[in-house]
Every structure is written in structure tokens, then in C-alpha cells.
Regions:
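Nucleotidyltransferase catalytic core that binds NTPs
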Residues: 1-163
């Protein structure tokens, strides 16, 4: 079985994340959407809320023969991948700055777990500037994020911030 993890904070999940998931589907038999619990950050949504939103959104994808699983973790991505029996870590790249960061992370992950490969997918042009942090910032300042995050996520952002 070709199993991969797609790790991230997903705070919140964006259409850029969904694009990477969709484009990963033909490459793997199973993809674990691995929601990072980082106690050093103050997220908009709890890990449980993020996992619940992702679980609600994933059935809208046409995933063919690929099974999609949502799980959460804390600690080292490479260790989580190994524990789940994954052979690959999927990462989206939006710009050169992402590549520089992701290359360092991929090399460290390879050092920690040499049997796990990192697969980079270039962001679709229409999402090349979209990040969770930018979506939160724009939303908090009263800007529109429709078309950049799933409708469910936008509704939950309105609920969370009372806007």
C-alpha cells in the first residue's frame, strides 16, 4: 500500500490545501491528513475543531480509490509518518521561500527516517499566495476570503469571530 501523510496546522484549511490533497490522490492508496497540535501557537481553531471541519469537507472530494483519513499529532512529523506506516510526506510549495524551508525540513526528515520520502507539489497558480495565516489576517480585518477557503471554513470563521 502506498500511504502518505499530508501534515499541517490547517488553521484554517484553505482551498490551497484542498488542491494539494486532490492532486495527491492519484499518487497514493491512502493519505492521512495529519493535523499538527503545536502548543506554542495560539490557533483560531482547536485541533478537534480543525479535524472535524476537515472530516466534513473531505467527502466532497472525488477521491477515486484513495482513502482519506484525518488524524492529529504533536512532535516530529517523521516519527508520526513512521508510526503510521507512511512512505511519503506530501508538501505543497507556493514560492521559493516555501521551497527553502521545505527543503531543510525534508532533509531533516530524511535524516530522522531515511525510508520516508518527501513529495513536493507546486501550488496551483490561483492559490500560490494563499496561506492560513493570511486568510486569518484578512478575515480579522474585515476582508473577504470566499473562494480561498471552503464555505464551511468561512462559516466557522464567522461563528468564531462573530463577524
Amino acid at each position: 500500500m502506498r500511504r502518505a501523510i499530508f501534515p499541517g496546522s490547517f488553521d484554517p484549511l484553505t482551498n490551497g490545501h484542498l488542491d494539494v490533497i486532490k492532486r495527491s490522490l492519484p499518487l497514493f492508496d491512502e493519505i492521512i491528513i495529519a493535523v499538527l497540535n503545536n502548543p506554542d501557537k495560539k490557533p483560531m481553531f482547536s485541533v478537534e475543531e480543525r479535524c472535524a471541519m476537515i472530516r466534513e469537507i473531505l467527502p466532497t472530494l472525488k477521491n477515486g480509490n484513495c482513502t482519506l483519513i484525518v488524524d492529529s499529532f504533536s512532535g516530529l512529523t517523521a516519527e508520526f509518518a513512521k508510526a503510521k506506516g507512511a512512505t511519503a510526506i506530501v508538501r505543497g510549495i507556493r514560492a521559493v521561500s516555501d521551497y527553502e524551508y521545505e527543503l531543510r525540513m525534508a532533509l531533516m526528515n530524511r535524516k530522522l527516517e531515511p525510508t520516508i520520502e518527501t513529495v513536493f507539489l507546486m501550488a496551483a497558480e490561483e492559490y500560490s499566495y494563499v496561506s492560513s495565516d493570511l486568510m486569518k489576517q484578512v478575515f480579522r480585518l474585515g476582508g473577504r476570503v470566499d473562494g480561498l477557503v471552503p464555505e464551511l471554513v468561512e462559516a466557522k470563521m464567522h461563528e468564531k469571530l462573530g463577524k
